[in-house]
Amino acid sequence: MGRLIIAEKHSVAQAIAAALGGGKAEDGWIGCGADAVTWAQGHLVDLLTPDEYQDRGWDKWSMDALPLDPTGGWKWKVNRQRGADRQYRVVAGLLKSDAYDVLVNACDPDREGESIFHRIVSYAGTRKPMLRLWVASLEEDAIRNALDSMRSEDEYRGLAEAADIRAKADWLIGMNASRAYTLVYHRRM
């Protein structure tokens, strides 16, 4: 069995593959012996927009519909921009493959990197053991050292939760304020 290593960017995935001894480039991933390295291409999974909550009637802009509040029923979707949906399908297929028994988060070492990884894994519905590859440099020796000192992904879970809380707060404030301001502004014209 092998490890599925998910980087945030293609360039980081290439550097990790090189540190693993190179590999065979496939469509959206790199095979490195029993391991595979793929990339997220940024945010592959995002929150729905208000219009996409079909059951809430938020597609009509009115003050009566405010505040928009999906709390308790937040929904996620695959990002359809810049070919992200195609890359998501590649990553999801690898996540579901029996060839990989351990997932490795090699996304950027920050809250957003944690969030990007966890959104993909959660949306794909995968439950496998997870490790964290904390890469601070793309030098091969630094990557090899990081590969030798990986820790449980659980130790970094708080970073992903903080990023998701920020994303939901941004959504609540941004979507409600934008609609309220637009509706009030158009009434005055």
Regions found by a protein language model. Give the residues of each.
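Intrinsically disordered, low-complexity regulatory segments
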Residues: 1-185
